[in-house]
Each structure stands twice: as C-alpha cells, then as structure tokens.
Regions:
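Extracytoplasmic "Venus flytrap"/periplasmic binding protein-like
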Residues: 40, 44-111, 146-153
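Short, well-ordered beta-strand elements
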Residues: 17-27, 48-53, 77, 126
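Immediate post-signal peptide segment of exported/extracytoplasmic ligand-binding proteins
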Residues: 15-21, 42-48, 122-123, 145, ...
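Glycine-centered hinge/linker elements that transmit conformational signals in sensory
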Residues: 162-166, 200-217
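Short beta-strand->loop
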Residues: 23-27, 127-132, 140, 147, ...
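Hinge/lid segment of periplasmic solute-binding proteins
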Residues: 82-136, 159, 186, 192
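Sec-dependent N-terminal signal peptides
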Residues: 4-13
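Solvent-exposed loop/turn segments at secondary-structure junctions
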Residues: 27-30, 57-59, 82-87, 133-136, ...
Length: 217
C-alpha cells in the first residue's frame, strides 16, 4: 500500500518532472492562496509539479484518503487535521521526514514551537505544520460603547461583560462549536488545563470544570 507523506515533498525520480498531488481542505480565499503558492513553486523549478486538489471538509477529505489508501493509491501530500494525523502514523501511512529535511536552524528557531511540534509523533517528525485554527472573539463595538464596557481580557471579565449585555431581548454571549469541540478545548487550555493527562481523559480537571460552569451560567 502506498505510504503517505503529510505536508512534505517526497524525494522521487530526478530524471523527469514529477507530479505531486496535494489534497487539501481549504476552499475560498485560502484555496486560491494555496493554488498561487503551488503555481509560484512550480515556476521556480522544473523537478516537481505540485497539483493542489480541494477535497471538501476535513472529514470529507479524510474519508476520501482512507478509501484511496485502501485501493493502493492516494496523494503524495495531504493536509491532515491534527486529530487525524496520529492515525496515519499509527497505521504506517506516513513516512518519517528526517531524511528529507535540511532546514536552516534559524528558520526553525523563528517558528512557534508548539505549532512546529504538531508534526512530531513518538519523537519523530512525520509532518510539517501547514495551517492553524485560532478561536476569535467577535463583539459589537457600538453596543460596548453604549454600555460603557471595554473588551474583556480574561475569563472573569468576559463573564461579567456577557452578563451586563444580557437582557430579555438578547444574550450577551453565544457559544458555537462543532462535534470535535476544539473551541471548548481552547477554553480549557487558556486556563492552563488540558483535556488529556497521562494519556487519559481529563474532563474533571479544575480548568475543564470551570469552563463548563461558565458556559452553564
């Protein structure tokens, strides 16, 4: 079965231009930016030709990848969502990258260490960080000004502000998440906690309980 190399180029034949299919889950402006990056890379050299292919959402792309790997095919590059990535490694579908990487130490030192370590499993690097999702809080500045409020800088101030904005006609805070609950995880980690400790679920930690209690209130 063909092995997958997440987010790094595989050294292939140097005798002819090699097509490098890259399956990703970025549409809209992000997808157009990926296409532009690939076009620029392809124009700078003639050894590889990166071919970006949008595959739908993360879940849709993962389903297509599993089917392709079972059929003995699949892309050379794949944008793996963080929770799916270790599965590829565990099933032997990802290649270790140490032999292919010759990076300037200064380049690595300039990267955000936690993001750079996303691609490391069991002490070995199987992937490179490609994108990172960050929760963003949107608020209506005019409403804040009318109430004499400032943007909160910690969770206690956040809760006080939300209560001050709540009335019979409106809620001061609306929380939206998805089945993966990564936004809730961000609420826990921002308090200094973690949903996993010693390879076991940690949903009863002080930080996780505090996040749940705030949402309940």
């Amino acid at each position: 079965m063909r092995k997958l190399l997440p987010l790094a180029l595989l050294g292939l034949s140097a005798f002819a231009q090699v097509d490098v299919p890259f399956w990703h889950a970025m549409d809209g402006p992000a997808g157009r930016l990926i296409a532009a990056f690939a076009q620029e890379f392809n124009a700078r050299q003639d050894r590889y030709r990166v071919l970006p292919r949008y595959q739908g959402t993360y879940e849709e792309a993962e389903t297509k990848l599993v089917a392709a790997l079972r059929a003995g095919s699949g892309p050379v590059l794949f944008q793996a969502e963080l929770s799916f990535f270790p599965r590829l490694v565990a099933e032997g579908q990802a290649l270790p990258l140490e032999a292919y990487l010759d990076l300037d130490p200064g380049f690595v030192a300039d990267l955000f260490a936690p993001a750079w370590n996303y691609g490391v499993v069991g002490g070995r690097r199987f992937g490179l960080p490609f994108n990172n999702s960050t929760p963003v809080l949107f608020y209506y500045l005019d409403v804040f000004r009318a109430k004499g409020l400032e943007a909160p800088r910690d969770w206690r101030a956040f809760e006080r502000t939300a209560l001050a904005l709540t009335s019979r006609a409106a809620k001061g805070f609306i929380f939206v998440t998805d089945p993966q609950a990564w936004l809730f995880e961000a609420m826990v980690t921002s308090r200094g906690g973690s949903l996993v400790q010693d390879d076991r679920p940690n949903f009863t930690s002080r930080e996780a309980v505090a996040a749940l209690e705030m949402l309940y209130r």
